[in-house]
């Protein structure tokens, strides 16, 4: 049986708007196993981003806990959560957020350098990832010189540069045409399987969702299977 990498246990997340308290996550339970790619398919406004941010330790649960690699993270200090997030969690968004003044290679090197990896090793790792994503020849190009699909491939490579345990993606193909989206999805899926990541992918694309290991949605603040 595959190892459980991340688990949400009875997670609650509330926001206060004026006199009202909005409950976004209400006792949410969810887990991801190593090498598993799960689609999160839910309408806008139901809490997809909140779920991703809570799972990725960007937001702290109001109740319940997030267990990452066997470690309870919900009540850790901000510094401890930041360190775990940098080491163990990768994020990909609909818009790539690549640094425009740096090349594709340098963008992928950046998180490794921040972690303290020597520049030569970071460059070698970045080049390997670009080759794996089939855009090695574009290593010296800046984001503005890349197509939308190429930009997202660089963003995915950057997200996994530090070999995280978990990849969380919020509409990673939402800004791409269907053909390009399919190519990017295939590259992402191959990377997940090859590296043994656990991946949660929020998407409105039902065709891509059907190609993942399983699908879940959000209903009344809970994670339920589709």
UniProtKB/Swiss-Prot annotation:
The keyword NAD does not apply. Transmembrane segments: none annotated. It is an enzyme of class 7 (translocase). InterPro entries: AAA+_ATPase, ABC_transporter-like_ATP-bd, ABC_transporter-like_CS, ABC_transpr_LolD-like, MacB-like_ATP-bd, P-loop_NTPase. PROSITE patterns: ABC_TRANSPORTER_1, ABC_TRANSPORTER_2, LOLD. Gene3D superfamilies: P-loop containing nucleotide triphosphate hydrolases (3.40.50.300). Residues 6-226 form the ABC transporter domain. It is found in: Cell inner membrane. Keywords: ATP-binding, Cell inner membrane, Cell membrane, Membrane, Nucleotide-binding, Translocase, Transport. ATP binds at residues 42-49. One of its GO terms (biological process) is lipoprotein localization to outer membrane. GO terms for cellular component: plasma membrane. Its EC number is 7.6.2.-. It is a peripheral membrane protein. Part of the ABC transporter complex LolCDE involved in the translocation of mature outer membrane-directed lipoproteins, from the inner membrane to the periplasmic chaperone, LolA. Responsible for the formation of the LolA-lipoprotein complex in an ATP-dependent manner. Belongs to the ABC transporter superfamily. Lipoprotein translocase (TC 3.A.1.125) family. The complex is composed of two ATP-binding proteins (LolD) and two transmembrane proteins (LolC and LolE). This is Lipoprotein-releasing system ATP-binding protein LolD. The gene is lolD.
């Amino acid at each position: 049986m595959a190892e459980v990498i991340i688990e949400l246990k009875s997670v609650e997340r509330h926001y206060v708007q004026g006199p009202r308290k909005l409950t976004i996550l209400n006792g949410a339970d969810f887990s991801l196993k190593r090498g598993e790619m799960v689609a999160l398919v839910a309408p806008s406004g139901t809490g997809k981003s909140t779920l991703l941010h809570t799972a990725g330790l960007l937001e702290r649960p109001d109740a319940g806990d997030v267990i990452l690699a066997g470690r309870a993270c919900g009540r850790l200090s901000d510094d401890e959560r930041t360190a775990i997030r940098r080491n163990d969690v990768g994020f990909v968004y609909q818009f790539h957020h690549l640094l425009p003044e740096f090349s594709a290679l340098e963008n992928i090197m950046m998180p490794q350098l921040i972690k303290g990896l020597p520049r030569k090793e970071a460059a070698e790792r970045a080049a390997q990832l670009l080759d794996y994503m089939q855009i090695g020849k574009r290593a010296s190009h800046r984001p503005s010189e890349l197509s939308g699909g190429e930009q997202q491939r660089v963003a995915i490579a950057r997200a996994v540069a530090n070999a995280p345990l978990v990849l969380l993606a919020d509409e990673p193909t939402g800004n791409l045409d269907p053909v390009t989206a399919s190519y990017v999805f295939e590259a992402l899926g191959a990377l997940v399987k090859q590296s043994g990541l656990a991946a949660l992918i929020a998407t409105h694309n039902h065709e891509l969702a059907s190609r993942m290991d399983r699908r879940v949605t959000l209903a009344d603040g809970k994670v339920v299977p589709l």
